[in-house]
Amino acid sequence: VYLMAGNHDYIKPDSFYRDFKWAENVVFFRNEHLTCIKDEKLDVYVYGLSYEHQEIEEPLYDAARPGEGEGLHILLAHGGDVSHIPMNVKGLSAAGFDYIAMGHIHKPEILLRDKAAYAGALEPIDRNDLGEHGYIEGHLENGRLKTNFVPFACRSYEQIILMLREDSTQASLEDMLRADLASRGRMNIYRIIIKGNRAPELLLLPEKLKSFGYVTEVLDESR
């Protein structure tokens, strides 16, 4: 297990990170200087650093280069925006790293196939973290790394669009939502958005839709 502190849990002067005793199978990067750790059994080189400040505007990774040792060279990189270590991912990949495992954003995002990706949070952090969450799994085959995203979260935040017609009623809207929830399952958490054109005389009660399972938000964008 390779662990580094990011901007939310950065290593303050009095942080427990500084002298915490980790388990033998955990490698923790303790400062803001890029360090390389080799796994002798697997011939894997892991490069990483931890945040000692909440914001770091310097591109600390841009000068990073893999060593010359035979094996797999993996860069752990947290950030990617102007306030949290801006970086040139394509440039780092071209510099010779076999894979760049990225952190900072909560949603999974593949930047370079089998080369660089944000795994995202294992579970959604808030209702704006829509879609699947999980982890990136890698397999080394014949000297080539193959990766794939593995869904893991127990629940996900999903968005349901309910389209109104001129003959729609509150009851028909509720029936539409009930059917949609039945097909998606009741394990997830939903944001409902009402769209479309409605009859002038139609009185909608959007808040009533919150009683249909795990609905946390209802937005009426109809006209």
Where are these regions (language model features)?
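His/Asp/Glu-rich metal-coordinating catalytic cores
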Residues: 1-139
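Accessory, non-catalytic peripheral segments of nucleic-acid enzymes
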Residues: 145-223
